[in-house]
């Protein structure tokens, strides 16, 4: 028995019941969940592993090209409910388990159309760690959210993995509130060594013997905190293991038997095992003690011999870690289970004499199908939050992001002004900036995860009479706040801060939420703070920033998608500190900042149907405020509502302070209400769901307005 429809169809066949979403193509991925096989539209080509095909095509009706991809079985993974279930597996079974986990991640994440390529590099590493260690007694810290996906599957969260980054689902990062196996929360990266060192010191004070292992990525080695923590770990000589997962992009030769896919040779593997052996460690420590006892000259000679020997075993960079006090082991093929288990077992079984750094080399996107050019045919975004288009809704309308309009406007300005340069600390995440990089490669500087350096670097450029645009996501600018104050604002240098991904972060949750930038920039004495209401104003604010040469300026915009429309790429500079009236009403004035103008327009539409006409003011500037406009609105309205997608201490605070100091609230004829993000972290969900959770949607604004007017029953009906 079988029934098919092209829209929300139900297919019954034997004991299986199939459901699928509305389609614009006739290709789907099927996801087995119990006795159900669910469908979602597939936006990616078929992915294949190095050793197996992850799914096979099943036709529903021959000749119609209506089909789905059936997921392969995962017999070993189906038996794993916790890390303890790995303990009795052989190395061969561990390799099979890694293949099945990789299959699971590719299948489910492709279905969600979410970036996941980085997670495929750490599958074998997670398997080896949980096989050797006794988690959660032994602490495993991941400083990069995507690297922990296999870890999540192995620690009892497989059944919820399809809810990753969704409302009421599991987080895309490690979270202490989510699982006892997550020793520490990850978010911005580069924090795991510091946190792990703290745990190791606490362990030693308590007289415990558990292991502490931190996993860092090559991206986080760009951040200064990593080296501060390594230096302190070396100074304290504290026993802990740091694993540097160097994920590479280039496809490498495949060894089907061992599942190896790195350029590391057998000699390197053998030497790495020697490095991690007890006898080698003891001999080396004994030699250090003897040479120190024999005197300075002999000690220096031995150190040079030791450094030379280390050069035979590890890469040149190993000496940097050694100088920081870390005992270096590597490089290891991060996809070779046998080598990883061998090295980790040796380290776990011995009494360490200080911190150890294990260098593993892995491949980003391992297991994904390559095209004819050797490039992976899938989402190119990985690492931090991206601004790529979200296809999960099935929307295929022509659209662009705010970042696209920003980059195009900046290119247009740079063609006229050769002093304009771009400094970004986005690790290549903002793909829109690629057009600037291609057009002006010598004027484009991507510094990786080095926000502090980026800000001061841009400040130095100002001293050299350049016009730097410092492009940093809101949440990552927090890490460079000291530099923003001391190196830019205090010296009144005209760095132009383009604060991307501002506001709620949707699936990325509170870790990457850009909620605080309005508050922490608007309190700085010399900073001009502005935000566009739409893409047209964004183009104008780029032109405005170019025209400001005597003080710093910042403007924020979200990662959101807008319907693509043709705009003049050269904007018109705005008058500093001036807003605009969009709609004229009475009684209530909505003072909107940034893209919250759009929510106010929705509220205006809702309220007008209820016979309420409100004034909408597009304020544009948080600092300096349009004080004449505020005075006029206070004279003509009984209620003032400030609306912003930011936290306490931002736009609404500045407006209320001005009204209080100006005496506008003294007679009691004007009442003020703020609409802003609540004083709590908003968990991951879609942006629309987060707006409802935070109470800043158009309907919430309309309900607040009705409550001010005493129409509480109508306000409640809007919230149902």
Stretches found by the model and what they are:
Residues 1-49:
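N-terminal chloroplast transit peptides
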Residues 3-12, 155-191, 205-209, 230, ...:
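Thiamine diphosphate
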Residues 29-99, 103, 110-111, 717-720:
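N-terminal organelle-targeting presequences
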Residues 92, 96-207, 211, 219, ...:
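Long, structured ligand/cofactor-binding scaffold of large enzymes
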Residues 108-137, 355, 362, 402-415, ...:
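Active-site pocket-lining segments that scaffold enzyme catalytic pockets across diverse folds
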Residues 112-114, 138-141, 182-185, 206-223, ...:
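A short, small-residue-rich loop immediately preceding and capping a beta-strand
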Residues 212, 216-229, 432, 444, ...:
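Extended, hydrophobic alpha-helical segments in both membrane/secreted and soluble proteins
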């Amino acid at each position: 028995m079988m029934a098919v429809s092209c829209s929300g169809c139900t297919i019954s066949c034997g004991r299986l019941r199939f459901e699928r979403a509305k389609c614009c193509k006739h290709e789907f991925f099927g996801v087995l969940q119990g006795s159900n096989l669910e469908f979602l539209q597939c936006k990616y080509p078929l992915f294949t592993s190095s050793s197996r095909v992850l799914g096979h095509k099943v036709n529903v009706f021959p000749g119609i090209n209506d089909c789905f991809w059936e997921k392969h079985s995962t017999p070993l993974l189906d038996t794993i409910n916790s890390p303890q279930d790995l303990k009795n597996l052989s190395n061969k079974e561990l390799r099979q388990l890694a293949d099945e986990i990789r299959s699971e991640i590719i299948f489910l994440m492709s279905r969600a159309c979410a970036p996941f390529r980085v997670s495929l590099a750490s599958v074998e590493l997670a398997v080896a760690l949980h096989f050797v260690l006794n988690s959660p007694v032994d602490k495993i810290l991941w400083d990069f959210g995507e690297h922990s996906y296999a870890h999540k599957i192995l620690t009892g969260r497989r059944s919820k993995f399809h809810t990753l980054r969704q409302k009421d689902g599991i987080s895309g990062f490690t979270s202490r509130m989510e699982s006892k196996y997550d020793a520490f929360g990850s978010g911005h990266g580069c924090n795991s060594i510091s946190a792990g060192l703290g745990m190791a010191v606490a362990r030693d004070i308590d007289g415990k013997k558990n292991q502490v292992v931190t996993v860092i990525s090559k991206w986080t080695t760009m951040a200064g905190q990593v080296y501060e923590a390594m230096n302190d770990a070396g100074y304290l000589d504290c026993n802990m293991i740091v694993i540097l997962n160097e994920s590479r992009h280039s496809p490498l030769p495949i060894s089907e038997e061992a599942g190896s896919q790195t350029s590391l040779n057998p000699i390197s593997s053998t030497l790495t095992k020697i490095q991690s052996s007890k006898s080698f460690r003891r001999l080396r420590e004994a030699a250090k003690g003897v040479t120190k006892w024999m005197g300075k000259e002999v000690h220096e000679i031995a150190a040079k011999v030791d450094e030379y020997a280390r050069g035979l075993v590890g890469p040149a960079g190993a000496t940097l870690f050694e100088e920081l006090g870390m005992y270096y082991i590597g490089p290891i093929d991060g996809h070779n289970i046998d080598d990883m288990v061998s090295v980790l077992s040796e380290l776990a079984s011995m009494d360490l004499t200080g911190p150890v750094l294990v260098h593993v080399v892995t491949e980003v996107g391992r297991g994904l199908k390559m095209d004819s050019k050797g490039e992976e045919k899938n989402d190119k975004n990985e690492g931090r939050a991206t601004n790529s288009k979200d296809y999960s809704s099935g929307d295929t309308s022509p659209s662009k992001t705010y970042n696209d309009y920003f980059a195009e406007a900046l290119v247009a300005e740079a063609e006229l002004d050769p002093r304009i340069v771009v400094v970004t600390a986005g690790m290549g995440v903002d793909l829109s900036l690629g057009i600037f990089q291609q057009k002006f490669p010598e004027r484009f500087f991507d510094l990786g995860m080095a926000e502090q350096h980026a800000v001061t670097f841009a400040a130095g450029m100002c001293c050299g009479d350049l016009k730097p645009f410092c492009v940093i996501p809101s949440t990552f600018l927090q890490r460079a706040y000291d530099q923003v104050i001391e190196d830019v604002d205090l010296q009144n240098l005209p760095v132009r801060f383009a604060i991307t991904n501002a506001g709620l972060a949707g699936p990325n949750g509170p870790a990457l939420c850009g909620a605080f930038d309005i508050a922490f920039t608007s309190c700085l004495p010399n900073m001009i703070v502005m935000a566009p209401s739409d893409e047209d104003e964004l183009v104008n604010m780029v032109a405005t920033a170019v025209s400001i040469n005597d003080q710093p300026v910042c403007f924020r915009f979200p990662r959101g998608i807008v319907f693509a429309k043709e705009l003049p790429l050269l904007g018109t500079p705005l008058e500093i500190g001036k807003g605009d009236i969009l709609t004229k009403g009475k009684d209530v004035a909505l003072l909107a900042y940034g893209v919250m103008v759009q929510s106010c327009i929705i509220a205006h539409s809702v309220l007008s149907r209820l016979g309420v006409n409100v004034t909408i003011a597009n304020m544009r500037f948080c600092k300096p405020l349009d004080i004449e406009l505020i005075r006029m609105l206070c004279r003509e309205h009984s209620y003032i509502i400030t609306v912003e997608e930011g936290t306490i201490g931002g736009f609404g605070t500045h407006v209320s302070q001005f009204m209080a100091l100006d005496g506008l609230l003294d007679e009691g004829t004007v009442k003020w209400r703020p609409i802003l993000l609540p004083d709590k972290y908003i968990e991951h969900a879609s942006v629309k769901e987060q707006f409802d959770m935070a109470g800043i949607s158009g309907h919430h604004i309309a309900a607040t307005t009705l409550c001010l007017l005493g129409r509480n029953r109508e306000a409640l009906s809007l919230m149902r």
